Structure formats: structure tokens, C-alpha cells
């Protein structure tokens, strides 16, 4: 099949296009909703029942997505127009096999295979000429010590394969080496390598969203969303804002030009059609941008685009349109946000099934609460997000944080608040 320009939309269960999502979490759920607005039939596949995406899909399957046999059986039964991986825990060999059989894997099997593995991804990014931090690889404690010494302290260690920043560690001195190695070893899954990176003293970490799609003439075309800012706590997204800065001077214009250049190069290197989310570090003082990682699908930091972007232009809508072969209408190369907005996570600090939420204090003017619908709560699991709009980035960030910190979560008859305050406004 492959991707084709789509000029006719149909009806689910009849003559509409069909998308299959491998992984049906909160990000997949939002993409599904956008696709359903265009009359698309949705099939959700995940490792557990009643995942967020399954709650809105037309049909769903629970299976081990690392099993080739299981994936092939579901795909052959459903025969989707496109297969959209949402998580890393997938048998990528099967994706290549399906692609050879004519199925469209979004953005393409090679992009998924590359982006899920930090060594492959870092080498791919470096090959484009994009600026990166210095880096070394290690396989055991001795080579890890040597890599840290060569890079110098402070430095950052990460497993070659992990999701949502698991196993990442900032080493401030040689005293942190053994602890960092143990953290990486716990999270590195099937890989035996760890990457050690130079610590970049950046002002802001940004997500640059880029999208490749078929234009009205059926030719490949690319667009870029103005970057959004975000911060992480222990490797996990905690808050994001869009645009990344209120400033619009020549220095910012120059930095953004470099951001779009890097995003375009990396997207071209990975290939395929869909949305790409590029994590980068920006050193505004020295006018430098460092490419860090890329996800070839919507990113958790991009949840803010639900509030910031024009209707039909959130990261989820852009991904759905690109995968379906629908042109993205925009004057120029850069899609600008409609509103200044921010997001802030709602975390669980309790454990149990079927969480409940006290949200009465979170509904301030120009704010909204998104509950993902995950059936199980455990410590620091992301269960929802607050979105807020305001006149400035600073005000939007404060508003989202304030609202999120009024939310309480219960899964065992005990209510717990939002306890993490690191990097927060006081």
C-alpha cells in the first residue's frame, strides 16, 4: 500500500480509511480523536486492557507487541491503511517485514528502528552535521568510568534503550559513577550499552516539531511548528510552554532558523511521513543550539499544542493528517501558535486501581484539565495534565502549575497531592 495522497474521506466500519496504533496511551488517544474527526476507523493495540486509546478506538486488542506472531496476526486480520507505533516496546523486525509486504508504517520502519535506540539515533543526528554534545559509549563499569573521565564532570549517562528518560543520571563528580551505572543498568532493557554525554549548560530545553506530508500535488513537503519549551524532572517531562519564548528579536530569529535547519536535516535522515519531535538544548547566551534526541511521533511535551495551536494544528492533528496523506495548509514554512499556553503534569503519589481526582480548584479561567483515563495508578505515574493560556509565557506557566497543584489523586481511599516542587515557581 504505502502512503497515498487522500482526497476522499469515508465512513468508519464501511469505506473509511483505517489506522492501527501500536501502543494506545494518552498520546495515541489524542491522535486517534483527531483522526476520528476525519471519519477514520481506529484499531488500538496495547499490552493492557482499557488503556487510554482503547477507550476511544473502534476496536482494540491486548497483546505482547514484541511478539512477531501476535503483530502479524492482528495486522493481517485488520489490514490497516497505516500502522502507527506509539511506544518503544515493539518488535521492529516485524515492522520492516510489514513494510516490505506493502503496509505503510508511520513514519517508516527505519525511523522507528533508529529513534528507539540512542546509539543509532545519536550517530544519525551527528551524520547530518547538527551540533551535539560530546559523547562516549560504555558496556561495563570500567568502560563507564573511562567514558565519564574522558567526557569530564558534570556529565549525563543514559541507557541506549529506555523510555521516558528512565535510567538517566546527571553525574556531578566521580562519586556518582557507581550509582549512575546502576541506574542505567536497571533501565537499559535488551541493550548492553550506556551513552555518556557532555553536560550542556543550556538556558532552555525545547521541542521542535516538524512534519513531512504529501502536498496537494502528491509531492513531499515539510513544515515546522514554532518551538516549545519544556523542563524535565529525573528524565520525565513535567511542564511545557508554547512558544518557547516571548522574545522575537534578531538573536531569537537566528536561533530558530538553526532549530528548523537541524529539525529538517534530522527528519530527512530518518525518512517517512508524519510528525517528528526533536529535543534540543538552546544556549541563548552563546547563540548555540544542540540537537539531543528525536521521537518520530507526537511527544508528551507537545500536549500543550492542544491549547496553543489553531484548531486542527495540534501535534496530534498534524500527525494524523500527514499519516493519512492529507495536505497541511499553512502560509510559509513555520506554523505559528494561536495562543500562548503552558502544560503541567498531574502525577500519582498513591498506588491502586481506578484513580479518582479532586479537581474543583483546578478550573480557573482559561485553564482545562485532561484526565488520561489510565486504569492503574502508581508512584509518579503521569495520569493527566493541566493546560492554561495567558498573555505571556511566564503567566501561562504559573497558571498551569498553580492549577495542577490543587489536584488530589486517590486510588486506595487516601488522597494525595502533587508533591514534587523541584524547578517550580515559589
From Swiss-Prot:
Gene3D superfamilies in UniProt: 3.40.50.20, ATP-grasp fold, A domain (3.30.1490.20), ATP-grasp fold, B domain (3.30.470.20)
Residues annotated to bind ATP: 118, 158, 197-200, 205
EC number: 6.3.1.21
Any one annotated GO CC term: cytosol
Record's catalysed reaction(s): N(1)-(5-phospho-beta-D-ribosyl)glycinamide + formate + ATP = N(2)-formyl-N(1)-(5-phospho-beta-D-ribosyl)glycinamide + ADP + phosphate + H(+)
Residues the entry annotates as binding N(1)-(5-phospho-beta-D-ribosyl)glycinamide: 26-27, 86, 300, 374, 381-382
InterPro entries in UniProt: ATP-grasp, ATP-grasp_carboxylate-amine, ATP_grasp_subdomain_1, PreATP-grasp_dom_sf, PurT, PurT/PurK_preATP-grasp, PurT_C, Rudment_hybrid_motif
Keywords: ATP-binding, Ligase, Magnesium, Metal-binding, Nucleotide-binding, Purine biosynthesis
GO MF term set: ATP binding; magnesium ion binding; phosphoribosylglycinamide formyltransferase 2 activity; phosphoribosylglycinamide formyltransferase activity
Family recorded in the similarity comment: Belongs to the PurK/PurT family.
HAMAP family xref list: PurT
Protein name: Formate-dependent phosphoribosylglycinamide formyltransferase
Annotated source species: Methanocella arvoryzae (strain DSM 22066 / NBRC 105507 / MRE50)
Gene encoding the protein: purT
Amino acid at each position: 500500500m504505502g502512503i497515498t495522497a487522500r482526497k476522499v474521506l469515508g465512513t468508519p466500519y464501511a469505506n473509511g480509511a483505517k489506522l492501527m496504533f501500536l501502543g494506545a496511551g494518552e498520546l495515541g488517544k489524542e491522535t486517534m480523536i483527531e483522526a476520528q474527526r476525519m471519519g477514520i476507523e481506529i484499531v488500538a493495540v496495547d499490552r493492557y486492557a482499557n488503556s487510554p486509546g482503547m477507550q476511544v478506538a473502534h476496536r482494540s486488542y491486548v497483546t505482547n507487541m514484541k511478539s512477531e506472531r501476535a503483530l502479524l496476526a492482528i495486522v493481517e486480520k485488520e489490514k490497516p491503511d497505516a500502522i502507527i507505533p506509539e511506544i518503544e516496546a515493539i518488535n521492529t523486525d516485524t515492522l520492516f517485514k510489514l513494510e516490505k509486504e506493502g503496509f505503510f508504517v508511520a513514519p517508516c520502519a527505519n525511523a522507528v528502528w533508529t529513534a528507539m535506540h540512542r546509539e543509532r539515533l545519536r550517530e544519525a543526528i551527528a551524520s547530518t552535521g547538527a551540533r551535539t554534545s560530546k559523547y562516549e559509549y560504555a558496556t561495563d563499569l570500567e568502560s563507564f568510568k573511562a567514558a565519564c573521565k574522558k567526557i569530564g564532570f558534570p556529565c549525563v549517562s543514559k541507557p541506549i534503550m529506555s523510555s521516558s528518560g528512565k535510567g538517566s543520571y546527571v553525574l556531578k563528580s566521580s562519586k556518582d559513577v557507581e550509582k549512575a551505572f546502576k541506574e542505567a543498568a536497571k533501565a537499559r532493557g535488551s541493550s548492553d550499552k550506556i551513552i555518556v554525554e557532555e553536560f550542556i549548560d543550556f538556558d532552555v530545553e525545547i521541542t521542535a516539531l516538524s512534519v513531512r506530508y504529501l502536498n496537494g500535488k502528491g509531492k513531499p513537503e515539510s513544515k515546522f511548528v514554532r518551538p516549545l519549551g519544556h523542563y524535565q524532572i529525573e528524565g520525565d517531562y513535567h511542564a511545557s510552554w508554547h512558544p518557547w519564548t516571548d522574545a522575537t528579536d534578531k538573536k531569537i530569529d537566528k536561533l530558530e532558523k538553526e532549530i528548523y535547519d537541524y529539525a529538517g536535516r534530522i527528519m530527512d535522515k530518518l525518512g517517512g511521513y508524519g510528525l517528528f519531535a526533536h529535543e534540543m538544548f538552546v544556549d541563548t547566551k552563546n547563540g548555540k543550539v544542540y540537537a539531543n534526541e528525536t521521537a518520530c511521533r507526537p511527544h508528551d511535551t507537545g500536549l500543550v499544542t492542544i491549547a496553543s495551536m489553531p484548531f486542527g494544528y495540534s501535534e496530534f492533528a498534524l500527525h494524523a493528517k500527514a499519516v493519512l496523506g492529507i495536505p497541511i495548509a499553512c502560509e510559509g514554512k513555520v506554523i505559528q501558535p494561536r495562543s500562548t499556553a503552558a502544560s503541567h503534569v498531574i502525577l500519582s503519589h498513591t498506588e491502586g486501581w481506578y484513580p479518582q481526582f479532586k479537581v474543583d480548584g483546578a478550573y480557573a479561567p482559561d485553564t482545562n484539565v485532561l484526565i488520561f483515563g489510565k486504569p492503574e495508578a502508581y508512584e509518579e505515574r503521569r495520569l493527566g495534565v493541566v493546560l492554561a493560556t495567558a498573555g505571556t509565557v511566564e503567566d501561562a506557566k504559573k497558571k498551569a502549575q498553580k492549577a495542577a497543584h490543587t489536584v488530589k489523586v486517590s486510588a486506595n481511599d487516601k488522597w494525595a497531592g502533587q508533591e514534587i516542587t523541584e524547578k517550580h515557581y515559589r
